Amino acid sequence: MFPLSRNIDRYDTTFDHDGLIANAGLVVVATLMSRLGLERLVNTWVRTGSFAPGRKVCTLIAAMLAGATHIDHVDVLRAGATQSVLPFKVMAPSTIGTFLRTFTFGFVRQLDAVAARLLANAWAAGAGPGDDDLVIDLDSTICEVHGRAKQGAAYGYTKCLGYHPLVATRAGTGEVLFSRMRKGSAGSSRGINRFIDELAGILTRAKATGARCVRADSGFWSWELLRTLDRHRMSWSITVINNHKVKAAIAGIANDAWVDIDYTLGGFAQVAETTYVGGGPLKKHRRIVRLVVRRTRLADTAQQALFEHWRHHSFITNRTDLDTIQADQFHRQHAVVELAIRELKDSAAEHIPSGHYPANAAWFACAVIAHNLARWTVLHGKHEPVNTRTLRTRLITVPAVQANRSGRHTLRFPTRWPWQHEFNTILANVRALHGPAG
């Protein structure tokens, strides 16, 4: 054990250790990238015309997993002996920037195809739902930017300059099943029906054979969306806007129909159920749907004659296996989508670096792949659920020294590292995976 230093100023600093690796834990996620065939998939499907696209995408994703939020941060992989723990040649930041600027809309769609096939490989290796039910949460988020030279950046409903990507996440794991970059002025539901069509195809190819249920907030509600979900045999639980028809349906609920429920600490809420008739302007589309309403008390005082006593939150669902209270509990769990979005924006999606819109779309697609690799590292490593920042602190950004003992390469990590057992267990489990067929 080193003695306690009372004079911290006595140390000189040099940057001359060729065998030191700043982010040696990348060996874990790099092993998973290799097992899932990421570089091969990119080389096969992304045809930008540039040399070794798989090498460049892998470089960018590895840097993102190490905490990169700017293109220049890729240089962290070129420091010391970091290259030795990666199964591909690390490219320079200038090369990565040039590569991103070669992207067009079609090339971004090719990168989406890579993400879909990578998802299928990960699920085939054991991370997928198989025959179990799959709950999908839809949401959009604002990726704020600064500067007016960014193509596609605009002011949306939040009055912030940025982009407005759409994501579909898997409840329980936080994986991003599908994503689509959109310009900042896009409405929440823009392109949602085409998005669902593509998402259904991705899940089918990934062999998710169980029941599928989609949850979404009122920004996505439309009768056309319900028809799209019905066409793909997906159940749904979607918040509705309290328009005059919904308010009339709520007003028709008898007072004795409301049931008290467990709610947030210090809060009080009740739920009830009724029906809602709608479907669109065409008579052939008319339908009766199940409307579940939760109301929360605005005030505890009795002096509320001129004001409404309750705030109502309404959603429609076609789930018949849940009673009113269970349906409300299930719908409230849609909030977990915000955790996945927070992790995305706490990592590479924190910053959208380029002035070119397709380059930023490619950056966001790579950020989604990096996010999923972090999730799969936890799942395949059979580790307790942790967020990406915790995973990065415990497993990825741990330093090590490269050593050669009798011809066997060894990474020497710090003694008394608090999570060394978890590190070794996850690495062993990931190494035990078999690569994709073909």
Could you describe each region identified by the protein language model?
Residues 149-161, 223-240:
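A short alpha/beta connector and helix-capping loop motif
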Residues 139, 210-221:
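Acidic/histidine-rich, metal-coordinating catalytic segments
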Residues 2-11, 235-345, 431-438:
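An anionic, glycine-rich sequence signature occurring as long contiguous blocks
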Residues 351-417:
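Basic, amphipathic alpha-helical segments enriched in Lys/Arg and hydrophobic/aromatic residues
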Residues 1-187, 192-206, 378, 400-438:
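Dynamic "connector" segments at or just before major functional cores
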Residues 32, 74, 326-375:
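Short amphipathic alpha-helical "interface-anchor" segments enriched in bulky aromatics
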Residues 205-212, 231-232:
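Short, surface-exposed connector motifs at secondary-structure boundaries
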